[in-house]
Amino acid sequence: HDIDKNKQETRPMKRNAVLVDGVVLNGPIIDSSSGEKFVEDVYRILMNELVYKASDINQKVCEWQEPEQLKKLLDLNIKDNGEPHEKLLQLCKNVIKYSVKTSHPRFFNQLYAGMDHYSLAARFITEALNPSVYTYEVSPVFILTEEAILKKMIEFLGWKEGDGIFSPGGSVSNMYAVNLARYKYCPDIKQKGLSSAPRLVMFTSEECHYSMKKAAAFLGIGTENVYFVKTDDRGKMIPEELENQIQRAKKEGAVPFLVSATSGTTVLGAFDPLDDIANICEKHKLWFHVDASWGGSALMSQKYRKRLHGIHRADSVAWNPHKMLMAGIQCCALLVRDNSGLLKRCHSAEATYLFQQDKFYDVQYDTGDKSIQCSRRADAFKFWMMWKALGTTGLEERINRALALTRYLASEIKKRDGFELLWEPEYANTCFWYIPPSFRNMEKGPEYWRKFSNVAPTIKERMMKKGSMMVGYQPHRDKVNFFRHIVISPQVSREDMDFVLDEIERLGRDL
């Protein structure tokens, strides 16, 4: 009877429906109850399949499938009509099953790994709120948390004041730095374009991240105007070579404007001598940028911050908390020593629909005109939440543990037959060869190195198809393919280090 009564009560609404272009506008058309149920069910799957299993070494790191087979397993086709609830849930389970578990204790493949639960919870919040961080009126909480975390990061650089912005990746942070340096020396270029500037040259090391070359291409500087400075056998920029390159550019009639040093190179984990480079930059009045995307987190360790001695003299720094600090991709900051508003002057477009100057609050909190983006994620919030939860001490312990495990692995490599450590690790990068028994008595000529270069790729293929772990490899200079092992996650133990060496030996001894 009640149901019939409710039906009768809804009939007048249907009779009085408002239509525009044949579309009924009365009431929402989204079925909130089914959507809410889907979110609840997916959340349960996430907890059971990812969060609870994140540190379970009995789980596979990956469930390898060839691309064509994976396309069939995932049913990637989009149809005119939506799929049913249960099929969507199965799809979610398959996405998890066939994705790489980067939170697994034996994922050593990249410069990110592990799962920080506080950061993850913060990401749940920001994904649900779907904010865009450009004005205080639409993102009050996230504007303030970004400001707070930037101030703290600036403090760790040793600056009394500064500015900054969170960007979508260390590559973009490096591009910001190049653009700021160019604007400082050639401010007319913003309005008049490249024709108003002389031939500009920037300098970086042979071991730099490839984003420096991309920045030159993207900003119209040109890749031929990136002068790569020689490094020593540990991968560190040689200051004398930098001086030579600057003199060379000047003799060519070019205008040097920026030097980019690296604190934590991608392959070797090397740290450039920042103080010596800063001296040269001051001598020639060049912008000094430090790409500390990987190594910047060492600043939080009293024991290891000396790796970045001299960083306080930089004009700008790129630092990615999503790497060693596990804040979750993406979480990347560009920090600038200038506090005069250079970031805003360089990038502002003064969009009047966003950045009205007669708002009812302090418009200094509207940070969007500092950014090259309009819509921008609340990436700082997850780092803020994690830092609040763990404190500086907790983050320092993570770094110290990761580097202690790295030293342990290096020491074990030196003890084992068939393993060769290529460089003593300076950070969390351990580079080594595994030499199968059949190679150990061979003469090391061209044929040896040709065959030996296939060892690491073959072992990598086997570990991926087995799903036991992931460790990266690459050639470097005169060295053929070798393993590059990265330690980050606090879930990693000494037993995992032993497992890596045992597993490589198991997978490669027959080669």
Curated annotation (Swiss-Prot):
It holds the Pfam family Pyridoxal_deC. SUPFAM superfamilies: PLP-dependent transferases. Its cofactor is pyridoxal 5'-phosphate. The modification N6-(pyridoxal phosphate)lysine is found at residue 323. GO terms for biological process: carboxylic acid metabolic process. Keywords: Decarboxylase, Lyase, Pyridoxal phosphate. GO terms for molecular function: aspartate 1-decarboxylase activity; pyridoxal phosphate binding; sulfinoalanine decarboxylase activity. PROSITE patterns: DDC_GAD_HDC_YDC. Its EC number is 4.1.1.11, 4.1.1.29. It catalyses: L-aspartate + H(+) = beta-alanine + CO2; 3-sulfino-L-alanine + H(+) = hypotaurine + CO2. Homodimer. Belongs to the group II decarboxylase family. Catalyzes the decarboxylation of L-aspartate, 3-sulfino-L-alanine (cysteine sulfinic acid), and L-cysteate to beta-alanine, hypotaurine and taurine, respectively. The preferred substrate is L-aspartate. Does not exhibit any decarboxylation activity toward glutamate. This is Acidic amino acid decarboxylase GADL1.
